[in-house]
Amino acid sequence: MTLTDYVREVSLADFGKPFKHQASWNRRLRTTGGRFFPKDGHLDFNPKILEEHGETVFRQIVRHELCHYHLYFEGLGFRHKDQAFKELLAQVDGLRYAPRLQSHQANYLYICQDCGQAYDRKRPINLAVFACGRCHGRLIKKNQS
């Protein structure tokens, strides 16, 4: 079963309305589970959500994006702040926020010498140039284990 077929099935089962556009995977999504594009009506989904959190959570994210989709084409408020969106999301048991992905691993850990603020980074920081954002103290590199 393709992703578009799966979204069509969820749309009919949970909303009673057809999904008439395309759904696709987008590996570049990092912090969201999916995106709705009002311009052409297609949906993008993050495959890492399905891999790490399973089919139940992924189905809730599909419901979330379908709330945007159906409300937009009905001419109702489809944004997160709109009451119609919040009510429909609650009716279909969709997720309000996407769960954090565990695949994001920090490679470097820096600690401020003065205030103890910790900074996890994927890329190294030039310690001669950068300082603590909270107290402007000197940063030191700790071994990540």
Swiss-Prot record:
The keyword Metal-binding applies. Zn(2+) binds at H64, H68. Disulfide bonds: none annotated. It is found in: Cytoplasm. Residues 5-141 form the SprT-like domain. InterPro entries: SprT-like_domain, Uncharacterised_SprT-like. GO terms for biological process: response to stress. Keywords: Cytoplasm, Metal-binding, Zinc. This is Protein SprT-like. It comes from Streptococcus equi subsp. zooepidemicus (strain H70).
